[in-house]
Amino acid sequence: MPTINQLVRKPRKSKVEKPKSPALNVGYNSHKKVQTNVSSPQKRGVATRVGTMTPRKPNSALRKFARVRLSNLIEVTAYIPGIGHNLQEHSVVLLRGGRVKDLPGVRYHIVRGALDTAGVNDRKQGRSKYGTKRPKA
């Protein structure tokens, strides 16, 4: 335990909390070609690679992912939720934060039903999360 004198000389530092989705906290001024620190809830990007990835132990699957170059010129890996997708290279996608626990390095989700990403077909429940319109009764 430090003495009062030691604390006077060098006070305690508060912990610095780092963001969970750092690419959303960076903006880009294309006119000045400089990055700014403007946060946004979602970001637009272009898919540069679409593929599958295996999760960490104890799970086993082929999880769909896309490598995305964002509008702020940062390239990130994003998860494609739902069953089936229509994404390919050069598709324009909308990204939100949110990691995938069993995929290392995946900190973002692609928003289904926005921009070039279609919603999930034949989905009856939880439709808003997967960009599916209400079925005709």
From Swiss-Prot:
Part of the 30S ribosomal subunit. Contacts proteins S8 and S17. May interact with IF1 in the 30S initiation complex. GO terms for molecular function: rRNA binding; structural constituent of ribosome; tRNA binding. GO terms for cellular component: small ribosomal subunit. Residues 1-57 are annotated as: Disordered. Disulfide bonds: none annotated. PANTHER family: 30S RIBOSOMAL PROTEIN S12 FAMILY MEMBER. GO terms for biological process: translation. Keywords: Methylation, Ribonucleoprotein, Ribosomal protein, RNA-binding, rRNA-binding, tRNA-binding. The modification 3-methylthioaspartic acid is found at residue 102. It comes from the Bacteria. The gene is rpsL. With S4 and S5 plays an important role in translational accuracy. It comes from Streptococcus pneumoniae (strain Hungary19A-6). This is Small ribosomal subunit protein uS12. Belongs to the universal ribosomal protein uS12 family.
